[in-house]
């Protein structure tokens, strides 16, 4: 029998056993958790320090550094002679360091000053002053006048509020186009971020844009910027400079006469002019009329604004976008058109190359031709009768060219179409080049071949046509057109040159020389209607295209046309080719000979002398060659009169002075021999004016006589031969001008016929 004490001890052991075991299990569990947790931590730490080490280091750096981009200076765009067409000028960027403000008065003064200078909302600027940062951009690309205001504000904050180091001016750049709208469709423009959006600015953006710099600012543990002394500046690298093949002088001449052509002929859908070096493919000028100001590329014309305003409000945004796209569009590259009769130079070249024709091959035109039951008319509805191959080209006879196309057949026709480069993009270094539209292989029927033979019912780009024209003239070589000649770095070192690239030879040199001869004959025979320029051998072809295509073979056509002229000079040593076309002339005339040829003549009459192309006058032409006025000022009246007469002119003295103070025409002005030089001896005598007479419809001699009777001078262009008749004058009849003023008169050969 147990004692009471033994019972109590047993009871205590019984009570203690479960509790102790529970505590032991709890301790083991805690220990196990600690071991597993520590093991996981070790494994995680090992993973982080090995596998994710680089990633975490980068993340840590990102948390400690604030990285701000600094603009690079965009490269300059130059013309062929080094004239600046686009440049980035120095402007400034206004930035704040808000954490440097010491009190609300400083913040309020800064916010008030900045909001007034830049016309910003005061509360928005005040909110910026409260940011925990050392770098907040207030305004980008400010110019000198605003910079001066900011400098005054900085000075005021320092003097009146003991606030310094808060506002800074950093270097920035703004794009400028010193020639405004010149070559706008070629150069293009940049956006607000200085990225190229159109033209060369877009195509060569990677070269022009440069490499931005950086401002790296250290941050403290709270995530706010540390003082400026903890900054690191990485300098930006300026962009490269791009040199164009475009010649500013030639471009200006082309734009001047093309715009006049648009106005004179009420052209509804713009005009295009391309001037190209036939041997290298360098584009000397490229014009799409109705250009825009590159410094303000979103400003539409009054005509476009009026049209948009008349549109339903729900459609106005869409209409504005379409109007801008049309304004920026480079029609010379991005649009296609039916070339019409200018394409005949390619068809004729192909037939010659295949020995299917020669200059004596005879064709008969009765005024129409039947093809697979369809009657296709000639522009000369009475017919050209019997004509040889050279006359066929000059007569631009559609029935004869249909026969030539049939001689070639659809297969050979396609072969030369491809050979001249029409089936592929030219590869010109401009954005948005369009593709041609032609019959698929095996799908060209007899009627299709017939109308294609005179340039209808298929579409090509203007740049393709001028490239093919160059191949006709240069020995048959298809050269790739280009508008950039070289690229230099910011120090002037050449890093890239664009060399001549010959794709293929499509016709032989012999065929090319024959075509030069035949197309020159066309110009001589047709006179100003086909690009005749006194003193120069010009080869060329007119074109008048029905825009709807030939779908009904009638003698009457639709009212919408494309008027064109494509030619080159000198014919015996081709250097420059030019295409001129106007889309939908809506004036009194629409034929290429009436609308485009005169513009071609006016442009080439200035461009060829500028390029130092030698003249070669006939004896008859020599009688009407302009002479240049000398400088007759600053000497006595007697001395001036002697010099004037020695130069082959007559002198007319105005005023009572003894010394010549001014003259009309001015120095180097071109005028006919025997013309009158007006010498002024005092300012009072310079107010006299005369009314310009009509000089249209006269022979060269008659024009000289009428101008002389009015005390005016004349300068001649075009067909200045005995059969020439004046067709236009640059100053309208009835205009008041000073005595001695030079009137430029253009002549057409009155013996020529209208052949398109």
Residue ranges and their predicted role:
Residues 498, 535, 549, 580-756:
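Ligand-recognition elements built from short beta-strands and adjacent flexible loops
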Residues 70-73, 80, 88-91, 133, ...:
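Extracytoplasmic
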Residues 115-119, 155, 191, 209, ...:
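Sec-exported extracytoplasmic/periplasmic mature domains
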Residues 1-309, 336, 411-419, 531-534, ...:
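Periplasmic/cell-envelope proteins involved in peptidoglycan metabolism and beta-lactam response
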Residues 72, 101-108, 140-145, 194-198, ...:
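Soluble non-cytosolic domains of exported or imported proteins
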Residues 3-5, 86, 220-234, 279-342, ...:
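Beta-lactam-recognizing serine transpeptidase/beta-lactamase-like catalytic domain environment
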